[in-house]
Amino acid sequence: MKLQIIWLALVLIAVETYAVKQGKNVTIPALIVFGDSIMDTGNNNNLPTLLKCNFPPYGKDYPGGFATGRFSDGRVPSDLIAEKLGLVKTLPAYMNPYLKPHDLLKGVTFASGGTGYDPLTAKIMSVISVWDQLIYFKEYISKIKRHFGEEKAKDILEHSFFLVVSSSNDLAHTYLAQAHRYDRTSYANFLADSAVHFVRELHKLGARKIGVFSAVPVGCVPLQRTVFGGFFTRGCNQPLNNMAKQFNARLSPALDSLDKELDGVIIYINVYDTLFDMIQHPKKYGRF
């Protein structure tokens, strides 16, 4: 139940942020997602990595009760956002070998659990880097053109909602391997600059409505609290949360500038503050 509440919060923040910027009555033909495990619906299933969830007990609350590769007991935010936008109840993983051409029309997720903006993150985890996800996106658009024509591809590029969600694995894991090159602030800045570069590249490929998630309070995940939070208190790992906040502080104004510079809509989606408040004051959000 706790995870479902958090998932729902992410969905509402993402959709409402988009609606405020774009308007509530805009028709969205598809949802296209890039990122990590929060949005992965099974892209890791056939990769040579330990980071996969296509086995029990994962999926026990998913329709049919079977594991699909989602890093969850049930659906994940990419599914819920797609449903909230009136598209599909479950967003397909692009790497699913059984996808048919018509399955591509309402959108897909390229997200790969364990990845990040730092290319080293995907290399360490043997998963799909966000940069390789862009290569698969180009392949996706080529398939749309081949099966449904140039006009449909143009419609998807210009009017779909493109969502980018990453940084947690970089901050929580890869920084330790990069500490000889960066201090905490400069690494967070490097990640934010990489995120902005990713958005630029996505825009070059034709995407015009792009939302980018902030970093989450990754210092509050159970592993960080257990290892670094104190034996009795199990508090959040504050230095790690400070890195996440530094990432956000650099990313938000950079995306605002990019939104003014480029045609289309580019939005920063702040999920950090709401999630941190839920963690610190759970009773405000009901019993769960």
Swiss-Prot record:
The keyword Cell membrane does not apply. It is found in: Secreted. Its EC number is 3.1.1.-. It is an enzyme of class 3 (hydrolase). Glycans are attached at residue 25. One of its GO terms (cellular component) is extracellular region. InterPro entries: GDSL (IPR001087), GDSL_lipolytic_enzyme (IPR050592), Lipase_GDSL_AS (IPR008265), SGNH_hydro_sf (IPR036514), SGNH_plant_lipase-like (IPR035669). Its main location: secreted. Keywords: Glycoprotein, Hydrolase, Lipid degradation, Lipid metabolism, Secreted, Signal. It holds the Pfam family Lipase_GDSL. Residues 1-19 form the signal peptide. The keyword Lipid metabolism applies. One of its GO terms (biological process) is lipid catabolic process. The active site is at residue 37. One of its GO terms (molecular function) is lipase activity. It comes from the Eukaryota. PANTHER family: BNAA02G25900D PROTEIN, GDSL ESTERASE/LIPASE EXL3. Belongs to the 'GDSL' lipolytic enzyme family. This is GDSL esterase/lipase At3g43550. The lineage of its organism: Eukaryota, Viridiplantae, Streptophyta, Embryophyta, Tracheophyta.
